[in-house]
A protein has these predicted regions:
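A short helix->beta-strand "capping" segment at the edge of beta-propeller domains
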Residues: 27-50, 210-222
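Short loop/turn segments that connect beta-strands within beta-propeller blades
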Residues: 78-82, 131-135, 199-203, 264-268, ...
Length: 711
């Protein structure tokens, strides 16, 4: 397609005669019809999407993002009658459509704060507050940069949010990196800080005297210093301070060594916890989701081995607000906590991944929570759903009323499109979606375009491993089918059942086109506890690959899969696994490696996030190069025989394009069928829908060529 750089070894003059014969023997079918693939991809996201959902603090109303032909809009309605919804917007006219979202309720439930670009369409989002008395929304800022995570102060007088002034890109390592220029690491570093806007009682908030392009109006201020990059924050209960996770710039690289800070408004930051310096199980790990206890004495957070900011999993920890030794509240629990919030001073509600289920539990604290004497007990799950849940803010986050009698969230599975649900702690609920109250029915009657899915479990090296198997659409047990193994990124992440697909490497698309698809959660994944997540340290490509291969054997033993037609794919860490596995085994007859890593030694000096590697490899590449060579596909490239398609974005900072070039070049030198496709102006997470579609089309064509088409 236009704009895509395609590098191929399809020139027959390049191959030796033997290599050409081998390639021909492995090609059981011609490329499939692209028109048919397009039709399948278009049908994957049928139904209406559900955006962010927020229940009001008094539990009487709900705000949500509703998709429409002109984008998403904010709707508000009584929780017991969502049909009576009204639009909340900064638009001056009813027919004006803006990009709006990230709404948050005021503590008194009488107003919503949200971001909107109505004042500068397509250019800049500003903060607005809309009172629910019918008066127009107030614009409270004149910003110039990237914004996210608004949060009202507990007293309702201010809204804080994360802000990158003068940003040229979204914050984080997933977005396309800026072209390298100037003094690297010093020039043009973009720093995310907590900004603060005062909410006026009435009247216009815009300061028309502010210089053009500046954010200095009478209501705006920065709460955190310019020498700290802030990732997450939480208000102190008295509204006079913050707790936040932050690190020295550059922010993309240093999240893995971030510290927990507290700060009085107008004061200086105080680092109360540095995982690199503490002793015990938290040493050298990562922290996320800081939550201040209602009495202000302690801060709870999630700590664990995490490979990516925003992909949170670990144990629930607590530390005194004055600092000191942290306490693990959930040691040896066989789950991965992802989000939590306090319910009084003695309880925490925790959203966690348990095997293939997302569930909400209540954690009871006994003793002095600001000391080492605190103990915990667990209640039965409020709900446990074999699917994806969340309120649209962060992974597994939920929206609750102030008294925590109601939790509202969206949920979907491989079989059910997203709807909004309600859970009430203390009520008797069964497992699955049947155990919660469905509030919306906008997708009633919508059926999946792909096959049935099942949760598989198996044993590998003493570990209990879970994964998802998608059957081909219109599955016939009398037929034999090809199998595609899709390995997730991370590695600290997990495949959770969810609706939709169609962009990038999509399991639902492969299933819709007639393939079995195995999505394993091998050691290193979330869902089985912190010991399981840490089980691949200094072992990339070995124990986790064994888990995957045992999963393949489990599928072969139970389903009519042709063992000679098994393919492998994945993105990020899954891209690494796709590169490495084909140097370790000949079981895969074709592979598609997306944004992978082929040489950990060269990667260490190329990427924008090298801080993540030391917790996994135990030392830097300069101190222990052998540990990095052991996990590198390039080390074993002479053993690679599998035809492999390689795809990557040219501005990927997490898994830079040179890693894909290096692997492609090595395969080409070894006369292994390969092709490299580079997508312009793309980072680690592709932004252009046309590029995401193109990746999927090429992957289907590659697998069809070497595995044969699905049913």
């Amino acid at each position: 397609m236009a704009g895509v750089v395609l590098v191929s070894i399809s020139n027959p003059n390049f191959h030796s005669a033997a290599a050409q014969e081998m390639a021909a023997a492995k090609a059981p079918s011609a490329d499939p019809d692209r028109t048919h693939i397009d039709e399948v991809l278009k049908g994957l996201n049928r139904g209406h999407s559900v955006g962010q959902v927020e229940v009001s603090p008094d539990g009487k109303r709900m705000a949500w993002l509703q998709s429409g032909k002109d984008g998403a809009e904010i709707r508000v309605a009584p929780l017991d009658d969502l049909a009576k919804s009204e639009r909340v917007t900064a638009a001056a006219k009813a027919d004006q459509h803006c990009h709006e979202g990230q709404m948050v309720w005021a503590p008194d439930a009488q107003a919503l704060a949200f971001f909107s670009d109505c004042a500068r369409p397509g250019e800049q989002a500003d903060l607005y507050v809309a009172r629910l008395d019918g008066s127009p929304a107030q614009r409270l800022s004149k910003l110039n940069g990237y914004v996210e995570q608004p949060a009202f102060s507990p007293d309702g007088r201010s809204v804080a949010f994360l802000y990158v002034e003068g940003a040229t890109r979204s914050a984080g390592a997933l977005a396309a990196m800026k072209p390298w220029s100037g003094v690297i690491g010093e020039d043009g570093v973009e720093i995310q800080r907590v900004a603060l806007v005062t909410v006026p009682a009435n009247g216009s908030a815009e300061d028309t005297t502010a210089p053009a392009g500046k954010t200095l109006n009478s209501l705006f201020s920065f709460a955190t210093p310019a020498n700290l990059h802030v990732y997450e924050f939480d208000w102190r209960p008295d509204s006079r301070g913050l707790a936040y996770v932050a690190a020295d710039p550059p922010g993309e690289n240093n999240w893995w060594v971030a510290k927990l800070y507290t700060q009085e408004m107008g004061g200086k930051p105080n680092a109360i916890l540095a995982p690199a310096e503490v002793s015990g199980a938290l040493h050298g790990l990562q922290i996320a989701v800081p939550r201040w206890s209602p009495d202000g004495k302690a801060i709870a957070f999630i700590g664990g081995l995490m490979s990516d900011q925003g992909s949170t999993g670990g144990d629930v920890w607590i530390v005194s607000a004055e600092g000191g030794q942290p306490v693990d509240l959930t040691p040896q629990r066989p789950t991965s906590a992802a989000w939590m919030e306090w319910a009084g001073n003695e309880h925490l509600y925790v959203s966690e991944l348990a095997g293939g289920n997302c569930q909400l539990i209540r954690l009871h604290l006994e003793g002095d929570k600001a000391s080492q004497d605190v103990t915990t007990t667990f209640g039965s799950p409020v709900f446990s759903i074999p699917g994806a849940v969340g309120d649209g803010r962060m992974e597994l986050s939920l929206s609750s009323s102030a008294d925590h009698s109601i939790f509202v969230f969206r949920a979907s599975t491989f079989d059910h499109p997203a709807e909004v649900y309600e859970a009430k702690p203390g009520t008797v609920m069964s497992a699955g979606l049947e155990g919660v109250i469905q509030l919306t029915h906008q997708n009633d009657g919508v059926e999946p375009a792909w096959g049935k899915s099942v949760s598989l479990e198996w044993k590998s090296d003493g570990f209990h491993v879970q994964g998802w198997l998608m059957l081909p659409k219109d599955y016939d047990p009398a037929k034999r089918y090809p199998l595609i193994v899709e390995v997730h990124g991370g590695p600290a992440a997990a495949v959770v059942a969810h609706w939709g697909g169609g962009g990038g490497l999509s399991a639902t698309a492969f299933s819709a086109l007639g393939y079995f698809v195995l999505q394993p959660n091998p050691r290193g994944s979330y869902g089985q506890g912190e010991e399981f997540t840490q089980a691949n340290r200094k072992d990339f490509g070995y124990g986790d690959l064994r888990d995957i291969l045992v999963g393949v054997d489990t599928v072969l033993a139970k389903y009519p899969v042709d063992a000679d037609r098994v393919g492998l794919t994945g993105w990020s860490y899954g891209g690494f696994m796709s590169m490495f596995a084909v140097t370790q085994t000949q079981r895969f007859k074709a592979a598609v490696a997306g944004a992978g890593i082929s040489d950990w030694q060269s990667y260490y000096g190329e990427n924008s996030i090298d801080q993540w590697m030391v917790p996994y490899f135990g030392a830097s590449v300069y101190d222990d190069p052998a540990a990095y060579a052991k996990a590198s596909a390039i080390t074993f490239i002479k053993q690679a025989k599998t035809p492999t398609l390689v795809v990557v974005g040219d501005r990927d900072g997490e898994c830079p394009a040179p890693q894909s070039f290096e692997f492609w070049h090595a395969l080409r030198a070894e006369h292994v069928p390969t092709q490299l496709v580079v997508y312009p102006n793309e980072g680690h997470a592709f932004a252009d829908p046309a590029h995401r579609r193109d990746v999927m089309v090429r992957a289907v064509e590659w697998f069809s060529r070497y595995l044969g088409a699905g049913s």
